[in-house]
């Protein structure tokens, strides 16, 4: 079986390596000339770590920058509502782990580590799908005219998926109330006093602060979708944050405000493709289901897609020559196994964001929670912890039951 995978993000790269290690001939193409992209998802929940195990890609090499997240903190009007340490499930459980995505991809696809059956082409953009006389997808045509024949084409080319559009597969989008501005503090900034993920809710807006796997402090700021990007100076952004940050974080922001970089806007898109496959074509990751940034589900769901697809396709190939009908049945099983979990987690993400939006737009509720924070902190933390279980562990096994 010849497989062409378009898109060398976590889903495409992981699937390519897993299939090639097992003896499948795989060609992986990526439009970008390199794998280093800013502000990419790096938080691996237990669900994503499980997927890496299933793919045979665990543990992440020690040479890749990584660290266990310290915990989760939510502050309202400058007062800590709750703080919950990782791992949420208690000592000995898997914590949320931050992994540098560019470094991990570089390690995964390094020439010296690459499986013999894997061919990687960076800086080569896909331009169209090829079809045989029966209308079945039979390969990919690149922008330079190169044709890559395949028994199976896998689209892992992101939320704006060219392959999804070329296959005329509609994306059913869900309204989403935010876009996100991402900032990074330069390397000269001090270490944060708290090594967890902090969410700030107040009259200035909804923001988050954390230290990345590579040790750089990052800041996310939510804005309405379609709204103009605010033209604030670094000092003005810092002042807005300080106005609703707890004392320790406010002090850090004031001391390190000069190190804040310019924002990069991330337009949030959430949706489900009407179907994830056609004869000879499979869509995975954001190409099939762009996710909200809430609780870092994009990378985790993409890896779970790759894990289940790898298991299903390798089981099929191990039984001998694969017919077109058998392959299509396998593609249908992959979608049937993965779609319910993705749809449910998108709904859970929306609920999580709705709670934050409620606080954002109800000043009286923020003031009430801030005033009674010492009294309600433990109960709020327990409730929040319970709400996270499915977002952390997923809801479906990583097999098709075949």
Predicted segments with their positions:
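Glycine-rich FAD pyrophosphate-binding loop
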Residues: 20-40
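Conserved mid-domain beta->alpha element of the FAD-binding
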Residues: 16, 264-351
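Conserved N-terminal glycine-rich FAD pyrophosphate-binding loop of Rossmann-like flavoproteins
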Residues: 33-53
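Beta1/beta-strand and adjacent pyrophosphate-binding region of the FAD-binding site
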Residues: 1-9
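Conserved N-terminal helical subregion
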Residues: 1, 50, 54-166, 174-184, ...
